[in-house]
Amino acid sequence: MKRIAIAIDRVDWHARRLHAAFLALDMAPRFVSLRTVAFTPEGLRFPGLEGLPDAVFVRAIAAGSFEEVTRRLGILHALAARGVAVWNSARAIERCVDKSMTAFLLAAAGIPTPETWTVEGREAAAAVVLQAATELVLKPLFGAQGRGLQRIRVPEDLPPPEAVAGVYHLQRFVPPAGEDGFCDYRLLMCRGEMVAAMARRSAEWVTNLHRGARPAAFAPTPEMMALAARAAAAVGADYAGVDLIGAADGRILVLEVNSMPGWRGLQSVAEGSIAAILARRLVA
């Protein structure tokens, strides 16, 4: 019986469904907080576990100091070095948590994405705003769930450095392609295949479910599925939430790639259990 560690600090809706999905596969799942895993002279020590798990599903990494987060990512690196399957790998998580690296890798792979700049200091950011000569979106470099987004039209709109930890991550704003309000798309990808998809519609420009957007069933085109698969591969993710948006010129652009995506909204419009699909593919 394979032992599966579900890495999470607070057991949430997703973790409970993953646990049930692994049980249904006759696996032995357990919740593990990475903060409790230790580096020892003998190697990694998991509390209450003899040896190492057979696989690790990283549902979330808790916030902490730079040193704490670095150590937790180090645990994932060490597990992979010992041959343990880790979803997602520390490398993929590092690439996706840092939005500037995600944007760089997408562009390097030739994947269409809104023009993006990441600079330090308000003066450098102001120069970007003037150079772009169009509306931009300021995003936290480390951020999720639509928090902290701000539209920037002129340099005076830029917040002070202390409000953004000194880093300005600016992406060209993509206006609505149609007349039905704001809409983008989330595709959940796993090993190059789509697991589920939804459209997110909102009267506001931030189309995040945590900000009031509404999920809707959606059948993506082959082009969209191929683009999402390429985006997940570009960051090295085994599974990922890929956000797409339609531009006014008809192009489909990749906005972001999430290496620890939630799927509660997706599950509300999807057929079958998403957790069951992910669990089955991890242990395949």
Language-model segments: what does each one mean?
Residues W205-V254, G265, A276-A284:
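A long amphipathic alpha-helix within ATP-dependent nucleotide-binding catalytic cores
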Residues D26, M189-E193, A247-G250:
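Short acidic-glycine loop/turn motifs at beta-strand connectors
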Residues Q145-A232:
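Phosphate-binding site of ATP-dependent enzymes
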Residues D9-E115:
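Conserved N-proximal alpha/beta basic substrate-recognition cap immediately N-terminal to
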Residues L136, V195-A196, A240, L253-E256:
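Protein kinase-like catalytic core scaffold
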Residues A109-A133:
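Rossmann-like NAD(P)H-binding beta-loop-alpha module
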Residues M1-A5:
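Extreme N-terminal starter segment of soluble prokaryotic enzymes
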Residues N258-A270:
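Glycine-rich phosphate/pyrophosphate-binding beta-alpha loops
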